[in-house]
């Protein structure tokens, strides 16, 4: 789809659809000087820029049929070739989402019936399919799709689960979701489930379950990326001991710089680096107030684990506000510009902006 066609699409969607998507702090972030913007664009042509964790247009919860084209355009403006589009499948337990018929499911809802979490997940995966069918984005099934998207000025959506609650303890559900395009699985979100234990309060001790271990093995066999975000330390250690592939911790902060529960310790940074994996730093304005602080977090991971083991996971539309300078319009270029201003080379900036993620994906996919 040409960029000139996008304004017509925006108008055709109408204001109602846009109003259904939270747009807090919808600023464009830090302004990028023209010369710096040109340099970043050159870097994007030799590295795959990727958002390791996002909920574009809040497609998993909001009353939208697709990811909205203006959201895709925000990514395109920052030269992002890949967006990992996450479905928080534990929302079937917590509520706070909108059904196809427009009804709102409130917080603290009833326990889902058997098959209900899987059905909700399939419906949200269909929203990604519909986004692609509408021509707003392309599909990211294999790493070559990202290279093609970059070459064509497009954005590729990679289908992901945030919390593997959709499996409902069934490996057959995993196989079915993989058949439908699932390429990344995050075992845990905001509840303990059939796979393991969560990171956030109230902290629950315990690691991977036997089913969780089986899912890790099958993910390795199928070429599905494993994301350890939201898993507690025991579950992370169990995954790292078992997996044969590099893994992600797609979005969060670092313990050394904040007393928070959505962080990795220096020991965990080193273990993930030894595994060949990548830690994604997020621009969550409630916890990482400014873009400068976000880049401080990135630099800490570089010092502890190395330049090859850090990336960006925006959690776009999954948080209420964004780091000042990054902005609600997801100005990834501002991160690249700050790294360049701090003296990082073009190659190193390309790694942080998505090259490291692309390496992990290529390894996991066997390409």
Predicted feature descriptions by range:
Residues 19-203, 259-312, 316-367:
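N-terminal hydrophobic targeting/anchoring segments and the immediately downstream early-domain regions
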Residues 1-4:
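Positively charged n-region of N-terminal signal peptides that target proteins for export
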Residues 165-168, 179-263:
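Divalent metal-binding pocket/active-site signature
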Residues 7-16:
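Bacterial N-terminal signal peptides
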């Amino acid at each position: 789809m040409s960029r000139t066609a996008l304004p017509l699409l925006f108008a055709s969607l109408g204001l109602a659809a846009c109003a259904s998507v939270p747009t807090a702090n919808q600023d464009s972030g830090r302004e990028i000087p023209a010369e710096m913007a040109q340099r970043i664009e050159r870097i994007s042509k030799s590295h795959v820029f990727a958002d390791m964790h996002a909920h574009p247009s809040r497609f998993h919860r909001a009353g939208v049929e697709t990811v909205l084209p203006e959201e895709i355009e925000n990514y395109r403006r920052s030269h992002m070739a890949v967006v990992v589009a996450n479905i928080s499948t534990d929302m079937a337990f917590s509520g706070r989402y909108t059904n196809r018929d427009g009804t709102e499911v409130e917080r603290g809802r009833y326990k889902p019936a058997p098959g209900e979490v899987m059905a909700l997940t399939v419906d949200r995966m269909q929203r990604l399919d519909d986004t692609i069918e509408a021509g707003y984005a392309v599909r990211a099934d294999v790493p070559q799709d990202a290279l093609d998207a970059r070459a064509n000025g497009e954005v590729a959506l990679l289908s992901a689960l945030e919390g593997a609650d959709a499996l409902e303890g069934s490996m057959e559900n995993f196989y079915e979701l993989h058949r439908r395009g699932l390429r990344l699985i995050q075992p845990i979100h905001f509840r303990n489930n059939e796979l393991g234990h969560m990171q956030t309060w109230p902290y629950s001790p315990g690691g991977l379950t036997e089913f969780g271990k089986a899912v890790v093995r099958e993910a390795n066999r199928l070429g599905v990326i494993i994301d350890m975000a939201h898993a507690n330390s025991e579950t992370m250690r169990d995954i790292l001991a078992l997996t044969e592939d590099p893994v992600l911790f797609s979005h969060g902060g670092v313990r050394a710089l904040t007393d928070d529960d959505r962080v990795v310790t220096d020991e965990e940074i080193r273990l993930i680096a030894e595994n060949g994996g990548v830690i994604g730093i997020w621009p969550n304005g409630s916890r990482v107030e400014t873009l400068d602080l976000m880049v401080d977090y990135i630099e800490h991971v570089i010092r502890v684990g190395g330049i090859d083991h850090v990336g960006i996971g925006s959690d776009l539309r999954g948080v209420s506000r964004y780091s000042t300078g990054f902005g609600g319009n997801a100005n990834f270029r501002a991160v690249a510009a700050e790294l360049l201003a701090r003296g990082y080379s073009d190659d190193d900036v390309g790694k942080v902006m998505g090259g490291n993620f692309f390496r992990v994906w290529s390894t996991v996919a066997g390409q």
